[in-house]
């Protein structure tokens, strides 16, 4: 089970990399847009400095045609290093690019997955991660859990090294459901992780223990 942060905000990454068992940081053009006019590859280097050498970083191509996707991928790896994961949408051109890039030794995250067949094709093309869009599928009345379950079953049946990296979450319940359905990893915004600890009962339990200890020991520490 892997937990990744879906953000390029350095304050969020610094905070949550110290709290979470962080497996990686994911990004896309929409996430980059939230940060304003940044030097994108300098920001990726800053992220690497914050999270260390072990967690993965995932960067998305922009071009939509086969040759353009390859050029984007080559530039990303030149700028961000050989260990970067290239996010490629599973379109006809994207699937072709995934096959070509895997032959060149690239790490690939197949993204924009809404259907089982997209995921199955990405598995066969050699993608390291598959990123089904959980909330976006829900909004289209697609059974997100069923898609994840079928892809997880295919991975297990074929003993494939591909992993399901579920993305596009609006709440913790969706994250829980994705993992229960068979996702190997999830990526979510800092707000989703924040909400995981927002239940008042959690803090009340901690406060009660502290108060009870204070009654018998007159101290707020052991």
Swiss-Prot record:
Q: Report whether Acetylation shows up as a keyword of the record.
A: no
Which reactions is this enzyme annotated as catalysing?
beta-D-fructose 6-phosphate = dihydroxyacetone + D-glyceraldehyde 3-phosphate
UniProt keyword Lyase, yes or no = yes
Q: For this UniProt entry, what's an example GO CC term? A: cytoplasm
Q: What Pfam family is a match for this entry?
A: TAL_FSA
What is the name of the protein in this document?
A: Probable fructose-6-phosphate aldolase
A Gene Ontology molecular function term for this protein is: fructose 6-phosphate aldolase activity
